[in-house]
């Protein structure tokens, strides 16, 4: 294994945030601080004689602390499993919007790194499913037809308004 440096930790964190916490991927100060602290943790561990793989695991705890549970991931997973007809290229944008819309639901829970392993996680997912389904039924999603959404039926062509023909200029 190549010996990690601060840049290595920075790139790992940046990639992790891009996938699991898209809004945080541009928090450069946080990324710099965490990658520096993770590298320092790694270097101290190696200096004490800890094997490199164990030193990386210790540094990862510093690098990813407080980031292991992802609201975005949870919402995106629900969209993927419960609404597979929503086009893939729209899911990220919709998930980002729904994370903000579902903020009151998330606030009711103590979301720590191990939250997805606790029994309350199942309850959170059910509340989110209900909230997301309700939002989609009310607002719609381009490219996805919700069975519960009351959409106006398309107007037959014969009933379209007729516009008078324009006089051609000579």
Residue spans for each PLM region:
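C-terminal alpha-helical interaction appendages
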Residues: 1-170
């Amino acid at each position: 294994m190549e010996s990690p440096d601060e840049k290595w930790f920075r790139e790992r964190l940046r990639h992790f945030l891009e996938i699991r916490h898209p809004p945080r991927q541009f928090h450069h100060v946080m990324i710099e601080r965490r990658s520096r602290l993770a590298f320092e943790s790694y270097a101290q561990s190696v200096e004490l004689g800890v094997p490199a793989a164990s030193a990386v695991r210790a540094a990862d705890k510093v690098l990813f602390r407080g980031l292991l549970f992802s609201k975005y991931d949870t919402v995106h997973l629900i969209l993927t499993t419960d609404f597979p007809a929503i086009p893939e290229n729209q899911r990220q944008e919709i998930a980002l919007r729904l994370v903000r819309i579902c903020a009151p639901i998330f606030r009711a829970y103590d979301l720590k790194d191990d939250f997805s392993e606790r029994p309350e996680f199942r309850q959170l997912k059910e509340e989110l499913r209900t909230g997301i389904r309700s939002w989609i039924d009310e607002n719609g999603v381009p490219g996805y037809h919700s069975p519960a959404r009351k959409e106006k039926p398309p107007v037959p062509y014969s009933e379209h308004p007729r516009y008078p023909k324009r006089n051609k200029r000579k």
